[in-house]
Every structure is written in structure tokens, then in C-alpha cells.
Amino acid sequence: MESAKSISKIVKSLFLFLFLGTIASAQNFKLLRYDENYESLKDSSRNFYENLKFVPLNQEKDFYLSFGGEARYEYVDFNNEDWGRLNIGHNNFLLQRYDLHADIHLGKNFRVFAQLRSALQDGRINGPRGIDEDQLNIQNLFLDVTLWQQKDKKLILRAGRQELDYGSGRLISVREGPNARLYFTGGKIMYASSRFSIDAFAMMADTIYAGVFDNKMSKQLNLWGAYSKIIFPKAGNLDLYYLGIKRNESLFEQGIAPEKRHTAGTRFWKYGGGFIYNLEAAYQFGSFGSGNINAWTASADIGYSFENTKFKPTINLRNDYISGDLNKNNENLQTFNPLYPKGGYFGFSPQVGPVNLIDIHPYATLDLLPELKMQVDVVFNWRYSTNDGVYRPSGTLNLAGSASDERYIGTAYLANFTYSVNKYISVVSGIQYFKTGAFINDIIPNSKDGVFFNARLGFKF
């Protein structure tokens, strides 16, 4: 815990300097901080901040070091979590996240990226969830070796601990919304050109504990696969992927058993001005205990962005179908597994996860000011199968459902505001009201509507 506090003090001091000082503009920060590259500062005069982002280590400046980090503070207020089933009522708590990273480039062919992260929780009545607290851990520590490079084409081998994030985050996400982000340890080979890229990887997952450097590596392959992207100019982008997982124990309403699951999927998408779309479908097969897996998902998210209109509004309509188990009394399983999804795929702090679900989700955004963006959502949720339950955003079982014939889970109403003070400082706040439906009212005696509020202050450098 003392180590985590030390990192907190260092990061706070750096952010205080950045906030009070004059900071030059630079590239936007990436979701995966290791995707940033500050080599463009090589031949320029640099202020204090830019000297943190590019520290030459030799006269030729092809050996260099870059530093970065983040501090995030969040207040959470939850009333009737899990629709009153836990009998907690009002539950408010604080979350903090700190990280520091160093990116070392050793010529054109070698690179080492290292990152420490601390995620802290204070005040939650029923204790920290797995997504809330990991007091201090090594989030990234990997070596990149460039095996081949020619013009815009490159082949890179990466080995070590690393974060992963692919596509829209339905299946493999770094999980940015929750306080503790995901990571894996393993190897990845990456090929990229101007219009085509593909990653192939084999990874192990840790068992996460809340203390300091106490996470335990599984020592067996948990995740493997390949993810590719093809760019079609003007038309959009096509993703094709295969993902495999192996777990010694997986829990669904049907029961607990070893699981080996394969996912084959595709995504066709386009963002930007005018017509926008995100279409995705995936099929899963494999084994669960002595039975076979036969599961699937399909999603359509279609909208329009009015970039040349005042407030630059966007309007979208999304519809998801995600399979659930049809009969818990036989050995075969039709429940879709979202693998390692991001927590906020159906809105911030969602109450319903991407398993056994049909949803209709209209949403819209407005740029109220150049620095202030608003998003409003309504999410209508049904169970796909009345023989399966309701699952959490992580994909774990929350409420068994085969005892009820009711299908409608409930309606979530959301409003979210993001204010960018500048490139380095942001404020995010949101409120969610969840009106319970017939299924929740049938399963939970005296069920209650849920209300969620959060306010988050973030710093990055």
C-alpha cells in the first residue's frame, strides 16, 4: 500500500506542474498508451513537458526514452444496486487510479515498454469488486522486436505482459470504464501495412488480488487467436477474427464445468461524418463439460453524424441479439460468452451484461460547446431465452432465470457529460435510472428501481 501511495504522490506532483505550467500541444493520448510515438520531437526545441516525452539517450537520438502517466478520481453513488436484491440501499464510494509508464526505444528494431498501475477503492459498503481495486501491479512490461520493415509494411514480435483491445470491445477489451484495467502475459506477432493489419497472439491471464504485486499468473494458455482489419477506402473497414479460450471452471445457469470455446466473427464499420455504422456477428462452438457449445451474437448500430450542423448532433439506433441457453437440463450449452468485454458496452455502469439478451438502444450525442459533449441513451432489455438468466457486464451469472417465464428485464435511461478542460484534464459525469421490468419484479421480491451517479476527474500527460 505504501508503494501505491508513493506512486500517487509522484503522479500528483507531475500533474500539478502540468496544470500550472504552459504546456505545448502534442498528439492525442491513446487508449493503449504504448501506441503513442513521440519521435517527432527529435529535431525540435523542447519545453519541460516535451523533454519528458522525448529524452535522447545517445547523440544520434535513435535511442530515446519517453515518460507518461495518468491520475483518475471518481465519486460513485449507487442506490438499489442489483435492484434491491442485496438490501444495501444507498452505497457511495471513491475510486482512484494512478499509473506511470516509460517507453524505451533502442534504435529502429528494439523497444521496451513498462507501466505501473495502482487502482484503489474506499467506502463501498459491500467491499471492492474485482473491477475496483488492485493496489499496485505491473500493467505492461514487454519487449518489441521489429523483424522486418519495408516502406509502410512492418512485422513486429511482442513478448511479455501487455494490454489488449480489439474492435468495439465486445470480446477483447482493456476495460477502460472500470477502475482496474485488464492485461495478459504472452506473445504476439503483428503485421501492418497501409490497408491491412493482423495480430496473432497466445496469452495467459492472471488471477487478480487486491494487494501489492500479489497477482498470480495462471501458467496455462487462457486466450489465443488472431484479429485482422482490412480498410476499404470510402466504404469502411472489415474486421475478421478468431478467438479461443480455455477455463478450468466457468459458471452459467446450467452449472459449473470446464470450458473450451472458439469464436469466429466479423465486423463491418465506418465512423466519421455522414452515415455511420457498426455491424458485427460472431458464432461460438466448443465444449462445456461433456456437452457441446452452440452460441451466437449479432449486432447492428446505424446512425448519422451531422458534422456541418450546429452542435454537431449524431443519432444512432442499435439492436443486439445475444444467445442464451435453451435447456439447462441437458448437457449442451447455447449461452454466449463475451470473453473479456469492456464494462460499459451498453452504457456506463450497465446493470445487464452481453449474455442471453435482446436490446433496442437508441442514443444521441450533442457538442453543447466545443469542450462539452453530451450523450443520452435509452436501453430496452429482454432475455433472449426464458430458460437462462441475467448476467453481469463481465459475463458472470447474476440472476438465475429459468424459474420465471417473464422476458422483459427493464429499461435504462442514461445521460452523460464530458468536459475537456484541455488536452490533459477532463471531467466526466453521468446519471442512470433503471426501471425494473416484469422479469426482475418476478424474481426479486419487493424489487426497486436503480439509480446510479458518478463524477470523474482525469489527468493525463
Which residues does each predicted region cover?
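N-terminal periplasmic/intermembrane-space "pro-region" immediately following the signal or transit peptide
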Residues: E2, A24-H90, I315
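Outer-membrane beta-barrel "beta-signal"
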Residues: N28-S40, K448-F461
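Membrane-embedded beta-strand positions of outer-membrane beta-barrel proteins
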Residues: F67-G69, A114, L157-A159, I189, ...
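Surface-exposed loop and membrane-interface regions of Gram-negative outer-membrane beta-barrel proteins
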Residues: F78-Q96, L106-D152, R170-S173, G211, ...
